[in-house]
Swiss-Prot record:
Keywords associated with the record: Collagen, Extracellular matrix, Glycoprotein, Secreted, Signal
Outcome when changing residue 44 to P: Found in patients with Barrett esophagus
GO molecular function: frizzled binding; prostaglandin-endoperoxide synthase activity; Wnt-protein binding
Keyword Acyltransferase annotated: no
Gene: CTHRC1
A Gene Ontology biological process term: positive regulation of osteoblast differentiation
Related illness: Barrett esophagus: A condition characterized by a metaplastic change in which normal esophageal squamous epithelium is replaced by a columnar and intestinal-type epithelium. Patients with Barrett esophagus have an increased risk of esophageal adenocarcinoma. The main cause of Barrett esophagus is gastroesophageal reflux. The retrograde movement of acid and bile salts from the stomach into the esophagus causes prolonged injury to the esophageal epithelium and induces chronic esophagitis, which in turn is believed to trigger the pathologic changes.
GO cellular component: collagen trimer; collagen-containing extracellular matrix; cytoplasm; extracellular region; extracellular space; neuron projection; sarcoplasm
Signal peptide positions on this chain: 1-30
Main location: secreted
Organism: Homo sapiens (Human)
Protein name: Collagen triple helix repeat-containing protein 1
Amino acid sequence: MRPQGPAASPQRLRGLLLLLLLQLPAPSSASEIPKGKQKAQLRQREVVDLYNGMCLQGPAGVPGRDGSPGANGIPGTPGIPGRDGFKGEKGECLRESFEESWTPNYKQCSWSSLNYGIDLGKIAECTFTKMRSNSALRVLFSGSLRLKCRNACCQRWYFTFNGAECSGPLPIEAIIYLDQGSPEMNSTINIHRTSSVEGLCEGIGAGLVDVAIWVGTCSDYPKGDASTGWNSVSRIIIEELPK
């Protein structure tokens, strides 16, 4: 009987080897052993040689624990360039005021002592170069103003641009009103006080602009005795501003 493979039990194999060894005859010369027995002995020796020293497989061991994490690998090679993206939508053009950097543009005209005592008409003028048509003009008149009368009166100081008052959005003006005198209040007191007329005007085209300060009457009130720029510096300041 031959073993059926390495899966045979150790006890069975040891028993087979012992049986073969017991059947071996005592040593003698080859000439005295019949050929049939010689073949049987040779076959037994082959079986002994085949299984002698064989390591038999034992039962499976307990699964081992997880190993430590390995070291980081070397960096990979750069990938191939990606494909071009889809074409974007058409953008919108920015307005001129954002595309170009804004350059300050201003001017000042001043007079040391106007001493202008007219009650109606132009007081002073300053010519300005406006660079853009979509900008606004900031104007300022600063100087002493006075109004005197015995009865109630009113005077108005206002700006004009190329001979017309501002219409974008409204006129730029300042008024002084003086009430009728009384025994307690002497309205003939002569007071000169530094005041200002200031505002923004839009809708004026680019180019030369004649900016002037005028004095006139108020609606529904008589004029009085007006004075502008007495004994002090008067000035007109003009500045172009982005809208």
